[in-house]
């Protein structure tokens, strides 16, 4: 028999009444009723109410002074609760255990946070005492949810014939674009390993090696700043790659996997469609390459309506090559002036010059700072293209195309939120496809890759030879859910002539490519199959499923926003002898 417990703290029921039991756990709550002390004993599985009677003075005194979160083992008799104390919110709510023996396994110090409270504590306290924070129901449930999601993902991949393969953690610097975490070599002085930003090259080499379907729950390391949906340091993704597939094949594999996960672990409404939105249309109609389809507002381009109009500010901008975007605001025509002024001020905080607007009032008249500069024909065109009704308003932003998209997208988001237009308790997915292959860097005055340099350009070598590089699209794709990018992938470029040409446009010689990506180019010289893949982010998926607003809520031991591990004290200084062993010298910043 287990000396610490005969039952778990969620197991005892009416059928156990009069049985002698042994339980172990943490002292969760204490209620002193004078001659009786009630204790809620908690373990990983649940809670059982314990009863300590004054008649057993030694035990009674012991428990009366014991601090919360101390660990105890008790022996006692299961009895039925009085009808007035029955608790239907817990599985053991019909019984309690009258204690006749207690062993203190470990006594707790005074707590820096109340485990039983729903009070929000500062992150520095929570992360420093993460072992306490993880005892709280909400955090614990998030971690358990994460475990179940990963188990289900593995099951799905194995059922589809994927093989799980672990790729190296110590590798060379990768091309993903973020900063690497570097590890100095003790043996090879002056040389460094890098922690992988993603298993990109390894999984492609696995396809060249003849494996048909690969996956792993892959740790990825990027020296990036924290955001609400991005943890600094490391994250995990369901990394997968397949040989002899098209973009459609990848879509057909991953969509059922995600739908299964979201259906299994959430009670929210799940829209099973994955509409496909080109990158161009995402930026035009949603002002973001991560469109939140729960928001029904659609941005429209109204540049041509304002061209040669009497509104000189926009007309002048258009002549300089700028655009005008319209963001509808339903049923706001009668809102107070402060509503519109607040949006203008918000736009200015984003860096916009300002924000125009028109209201279409109940008397069918158009009002606002811009309305008087537009004739009836132009006003009607705006109403038509923006699908406006009487009582609606519309905001306008005029900037360069990229800034107009950004500002309009932010206005769309804040309007959707303030006007309660966001569809509640639902998940809406979409694909963003047809990303540009190249981009122009105004600062460097050069062409570079827009995203993944190893993706296949649409049109192949012919497009690279004959098209304007900035017009070429890539076989790259993202999955977005509720405005959060949860996955990114691509059909890979498996042909060396196309790869060399693509890199040459981005300023790399063949020798530079061979040196930087030697493992991949060598492998491609020995027969490379067409291949592609995708990598849904596990942290972000669990964040959505847990309805958390911050990704750190679903990571067991997260870094804080400054990239510090307050529990373990990392990063930390290294002693001089260790630095000498690695041939390193630290130069203090002045």
Swiss-Prot record:
The record marks 33 as: Important for tRNA non-discrimination. This is Aspartate--tRNA(Asp/Asn) ligase. It is found in: Cytoplasm. It catalyses: tRNA(Asx) + L-aspartate + ATP = L-aspartyl-tRNA(Asx) + AMP + diphosphate. HAMAP family: Asp_tRNA_synth_type1. PANTHER family: ASPARTATE--TRNA LIGASE, MITOCHONDRIAL, ASPARTYL/LYSYL-TRNA SYNTHETASE. It comes from the Bacteria. InterPro entries: Aa-tRNA-synt_II, aa-tRNA-synth_II, aa-tRNA-synth_II/BPL/LPL, Asp-tRNA-ligase_1, Asp-tRNA-ligase_1_N, Asp/Asn-tRNA-synth_IIb, AspRS_core, GAD-like_sf. GO terms for cellular component: cytoplasm. Homodimer. It comes from Ehrlichia canis (strain Jake). Its EC number is 6.1.1.23. Coiled coil: none annotated. NCBIfam families: aspS_bact, PRK00476.1. GO terms for molecular function: aspartate-tRNA ligase activity; aspartate-tRNA(Asn) ligase activity; ATP binding; nucleic acid binding. SUPFAM superfamilies: Class II aaRS and biotin synthetases, GAD domain-like, Nucleic acid-binding proteins. ATP binds at residues 222-224, 485, 537-540. The keyword NADP does not apply. Keywords: Aminoacyl-tRNA synthetase, ATP-binding, Cytoplasm, Ligase, Nucleotide-binding, Protein biosynthesis. GO terms for biological process: aspartyl-tRNA aminoacylation. Pfam families: GAD (PF02938), tRNA-synt_2 (PF00152), tRNA_anti-codon (PF01336).
